[in-house]
């Protein structure tokens, strides 16, 4: 009987310790839950809340592979996307109505605007977006608009540098599908990172370089992308002023055809040469 009482006492002690452990665990969970409620933290990825407006200029509209690229990337990162193409800009007039972009921003209230080949006259509307919605990230790729309006209206402006030994009189740029998709994916990567970090932790040049490297490295592993690029900030040929948010790309691997020969002084961007 003494053995039984001792055994029962031991079991009772174990049960008491188990209750104590459970009570402490519940208390810790409630403290974590209370702390989460106080801080306003919601266990949902910020990228799932991001809305992105894409604007395609004349040269890049009507290409299914670009729209498919946007849809795949935004679906993978749970972004809501809307694409405004050149046909949407010219639906009511022969010339593009760039005000359509501003109207789309008012309607969608996007976290970011990504343009590819923005037509002439679009820069002032991007600047209007920045004035009305300073928190909206604007990434501009290969614009046809003048340099200064694009620099003023963009957080990150990306163009291709033209080499000094280019030929005069050629006014076209040859882009591959892989290159255009890489630019779009890099822009989306920047949008995603900004959504997580809430603000930039690097310069526009560093930010784009990192995003573009991630994209191209992934494509190289798939055997899709083979070119290598150097990047630098745009320098105004007349004043010598370096643009903080204007990134110029130039190929290190010349065998990969991308930019045809252009004339003019070195350091000027492709869309400047188009107007020469």
Swiss-Prot record:
It is found in: Cell membrane. It is a lipid-anchor. Keywords: Cell membrane, Lipoprotein, Membrane, Palmitate, Signal. The keyword Cell membrane applies. A lipid is attached at residue 29 (S-diacylglycerol cysteine). A lipid is attached at residue 29 (N-palmitoyl cysteine). Residues 1-28 form the signal peptide. This is Uncharacterized lipoprotein TP_0938. The lineage of its organism: Bacteria, Pseudomonadati, Spirochaetota, Spirochaetia, Spirochaetales.
